[in-house]
Design a protein with these regions (language model features):
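N-proximal low-complexity "stem/linker" segments adjacent to membrane-targeting elements
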Residues: 1-25
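Glycine-rich, basic loop-to-helix element that forms the pyrophosphate-binding segment
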Residues: 67-83
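Donor-binding/catalytic cores of nucleotide-activated saccharide
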Residues: 72, 95-206, 214, 218-230
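Catalytic core of nucleotide-sugar-dependent glycosyltransferases
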Residues: 211-220, 226-254, 270-303
Length: 342
């Protein structure tokens, strides 16, 4: 039996209202794809039934896995454990893929695999779909990556603060995810950052297509990236940030300057996001948590890594003078209006 080109993992938790749209877009890949629907202990709706329905209807494509509730990360872990595809992509059940772009990506991957030049990481654009005002905007990487050719870290350009590789933009080779030993924490939101970050040192070759593949739904009141929800769940953001501080030794990457620079950029962004939502909380307890996070970074990284983050982008959100917090929050509000990232 020929190996599937790609495994799509779809963690589902009480997703009956919208998961069908997601699944139907993935089915457009046909027999090239394996679709793993992970029912994460859903009890409030027909999610388990829908998973089984698709598995019965498309037995050579769809697998349904039912697990005790473990959170989004455990859904991703479950997908990796069971994946048989050469590549692995996570698609959240309220998001979807553009079917035309998907056909082009899969055709290119098939060509690269046939030639023996399959990359460790395939990158595409993603699109924020804002339901509250019907607008959308695309995050693309044309200023960072060469297009339509295999490249390495030495060919990577500069990331702007509003640009990061997110789960939405990446397809990893499944063996890369297994080789890096990544296990996402259970019952924790925002683990998609770990999913992108931890495997990066194991990526030697990449390929970028300037296609708007992933459609990222923004607008549900209970969504994990909703601002008020993020403030309430800030402890989970801190847990993920600490995990990322610990999971890779950036000083071991000095021979890969651009890889190390990007991972410093990503970790700086995580520190900045944590700072902002602790500032939005505004309590004395949150202020202590902010101090504790920076102390954790100091104690668990080298002086060089700490300085790079503290006096770089990560430190912009931790201004040591009166009204510094107000300036940071004001800057966040302006950026949110411009980039509409949540």
């Amino acid at each position: 039996m020929q190996q599937k080109l790609i495994t799509f993992a779809v963690p589902c938790y009480n997703s009956a209202a919208y998961m069908r749209h997601c699944i139907e877009t993935l089915l457009s890949a046909g027999e090239q794809a394996e679709i793993i629907l992970v029912d994460d202990g859903s009890v409030k709706d027909e999610t388990p039934v829908i998973c089984d329905e698709y598995a019965a209807k498309y037995p050579t494509i769809v697998k349904a896995i039912h697990q005790e509730n473990g959170g989004h990360g455990e859904g991703v872990n479950q997908g990796i454990r069971n994946a048989t595809g050469l590549y692995y992509k996570v698609v959240d059940s309220d998001d979807w893929l553009d079917t035309d772009a998907l056909q082009k990506v899969l055709a290119r991957l098939h060509t690269l695999v046939t030639r023996g030049t399959a990359p460790d990481l395939m990158i595409c654009n993603y699109v924020y779909e804002h339901t509250e005002d019907g607008t959308s905007h695309t995050v693309r990487y044309t200023n960072i990556f060469p297009q339509e050719r295999l490249f390495t870290w030495m060919h990577v350009g500069h990331f702007r603060p509003d640009q990061n590789l997110l789960m939405h933009s990446v397809m990893y080779r499944t063996e890369v995810l297994r080789k890096c030993g990544m296990v996402l924490p259970k019952h924790t939101f925002y683990v998609d950052n770990i999913f992108v970050y931890q495997p990066l040192p194991f990526v030697k070759t990449m390929y970028y297509m300037d296609l708007d593949l992933y459609r990222y739904f923004i607008g549900r009141a209970d969504q994990s990236v909703n601002e008020s929800v993020m403030v309430k769940r800030v402890d989970q953001q801190l847990r993920v940030t600490r995990h990322m501080i610990d999971c890779q030794d950036l000083d071991a990457l000095k021979g890969e300057k651009k890889l190390r620079a990007y991972m410093l950029h990503y970790l700086s962004m995580m520190m900045a996001v944590s700072d902002i939502f602790l500032l939005l909380d505004g309590s004395a307890e949150a202020k202590e948590k902010q101090k504790g996070l920076w102390q954790y970074l100091r104690e668990h990284t080298s002086a060089a890594v700490y300085r790079s983050i503290r006096f770089g982008f990560g430190g912009v959100t931790n201004l040591p003078f009166p009204k510094g917090d107000a300036i940071v929050v004001g800057g966040y509000r302006i950026a949110r209006k411009i980039f509409k990232f949540n």
